[in-house]
Amino acid sequence: MAQNLKDFAGRLPAGPRGMGTAMKLLLGAGAVAYAVKESVFTVEGGHRAIFFNRIGGVQQDTILAEGLHFRFPWFQYPIIYDIRARPRKISSPTGSKDLQMVNITLRVLSRPLASELPFMYQRLGLDYDERVLPSIVNEVLKSVVAKFNASQLITQRAQVSLLIRRELTERAKDFSIILDDVAITELSFSREYTAAVESKQVAQQEAQRAQFLVEKAKQDQKQKIVQAEGEAAAAKMIGDALSKNPGYLKLRRIRAAQSIAKTIASSQNRVYLNADSLVLNLQDDTFTRGSDSLVAKQTKK
């Protein structure tokens, strides 16, 4: 480039001697600035760089950290890698142990091993994740999922995820790739299997509902039996009380008469009824004779 500028300056028309000297100084300064610019480069945070020179190729023993670095222009140029963890989602259809088709989506956090960048560049280039991850994920998923039934993939999801992560991490080490996290984000089955599972769940819920109704009927029956036994015991106690104390029935009739009288007194309507039918005439002989006859009948029983 500097030589081209000098040739261009030589083709310009000749001028005063001072102007020619200034032009030469300007061209020299431009050449120096260009050389300095091409000799310096910066490695940003979270990145690493390796050198490729035009004679020996990739320099295996040089890995440049973050910051400002120098190089020989034209003879060397840097290759910069991003070594931060990057997420990637990979989906793979595979078959379970009971021959059910399963679609699994994994979220993988991957980054290159910084100490192996020269080796990685020679084998895989800069797009290492695109070349490696889809193939090894499919390989590991098929080998792991084939060990479980479709139902076990749901009930033992944590165990399946742990096994996938362990095998995938070991497999990625062969390509100098570090996996910081592997997680199952989606797990789906074929329409036929999903419909069969839903039908089974509905049948189980109906069976549980029927069992609940049977248990409820049994509890209601027991409650009625207990209630009937309680009413029978209460009737027996009343009968015993009548046989031992005839005045108990008279007391009950007096309380009933009081309740009837209170209800009629508080009513806005006025109704005239036979006093005998309302058992309000407590001084009448019929009241006493009626009570005594009931006590006699109860005693005979």
Swiss-Prot record:
Q: What residue spans carry the region label Necessary for transcriptional repression?
A: 19-49, 150-174
By its UniProt entry, which CDD domains does this protein fall under? SPFH_prohibitin
**Which controlled-vocabulary keywords does the entry list?**
Cell membrane, Coiled coil, Cytoplasm, Membrane, Mitochondrion, Mitochondrion inner membrane, Nucleus, Receptor, Repressor, Transcription, Transcription regulation
Q: Is GTP-binding a UniProt keyword of this protein?
A: no
Stored SUPFAM superfamilies: Band 7/SPFH domain
What are the TM regions of this chain, as residue ranges?
none
An example GO biological process term is: mitophagy
Report one GO cellular component.
Answer: cytoplasm
What is its subcellular localisation? Mitochondrion inner membrane; Cytoplasm; Nucleus; Cell membrane
Question: Coiled-coil segments, which residues?
Answer: 191-237
GO molecular function (one): protein homodimerization activity
Q: What does this protein do?
A: Protein with pleiotropic attributes mediated in a cell-compartment- and tissue-specific manner, which include the plasma membrane-associated cell signaling functions, mitochondrial chaperone, and transcriptional co-regulator of transcription factors and sex steroid hormones in the nucleus. In the mitochondria, together with PHB, forms large ring complexes (prohibitin complexes) in the inner mitochondrial membrane (IMM) and functions as a chaperone protein that stabilizes mitochondrial respiratory enzymes and maintains mitochondrial integrity in the IMM, which is required for mitochondrial morphogenesis, neuronal survival, and normal lifespan.
Indicate the quaternary assembly.
The mitochondrial prohibitin complex consists of two subunits (PHB1 and PHB2), assembled into a membrane-associated ring-shaped supercomplex of approximately 1 mDa.
Entry's family note: Belongs to the prohibitin family.
Q: What is this protein called?
A: Prohibitin-2
Tell me what organism the protein belongs to. Xenopus tropicalis
Specify the taxonomic lineage. Answer: Eukaryota, Metazoa, Chordata, Craniata, Vertebrata
